Amino acid sequence: MINKKIITTKNISKVIKDKYILKDISFDISEGECVALIGPNGAGKTTLMNCLLGAKFITSGDIKVNDLKPTDRTLKNYVNVLSQENAVPERLKVSELITFVQKIYEDHLNNQEIDNILRFDDKQKDTLASKLSGGQRRLLSFALTLIGKPKIIFLDEPTAGMDTSTRIRFWEIVNKLKNNGLTIIYSSHYIEEVEHTADRILVLHKGELIRDTTPHAMRAEEVEKFFTLPLQYLEVLKDNENVYNLEVKHDSFNFLTKKPEEIWTLLQAAGCTLKDLEIQNRTLLDSVFATTKEN
């Protein structure tokens, strides 16, 4: 059975001060899919999420969420978002905050369902939400996002500030939500969170959608070679057509190539030996996350 398209975008662009923040992006997301948005800082991930949520307007193109414009008020309880910032009140205890949010929704998670997500003890529930650790606040914010039983959730860098054990717990919850048919769109700086959780990957770079693929397909793509060399060999390669993403550092430079044999022939002719260079394999997925970490 083919699932219904729950989000559709057609040629959407967003321009600010004559600069494209998003440029001519089109994709669909089906009901129940788990989709990862990846790309370097400044690629447009958060802006795209905000446009899908109706929090920011697009300059051109069209977005539909459940066949409605993202600003339609009937989507209020249908969609929710975990933003990058943990916005928790200063003076409410965890238990008080949960009760407050439950009262917003006619149909909401009960206390036992929330306990199953948080696994907080009585002392933690009696603590001011603002006094929790960063990872606990993040998990609490996530639970608050789910209280109204949304059908679509957006998670913007969801595990930021979490320790390893909390992060593992978080993705256990996400996988259960996937199995229950929730549609999930998230961004991440962790490669393992994309490989093990996402059904699809949307790769953004400088506001453009450069790839719509799956973790398996992306891993199977052609492998590039990542070279690191001393600066003395820069003149040999700096204008070579098979060298790209060249970056010069204090005492070395690095680059990517799909023609390592040709590059090695040139380097040998210039007196380079194996001890002078370092070579690593990189798929596109590796390259995206390496760029993200550097930024």
Q: Where are these predicted regions, by residue range?
A:
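Conserved ABC transporter NBD signature motif
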Residues: 54, 60-77
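Conserved ABC ATPase signature
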Residues: 128-132
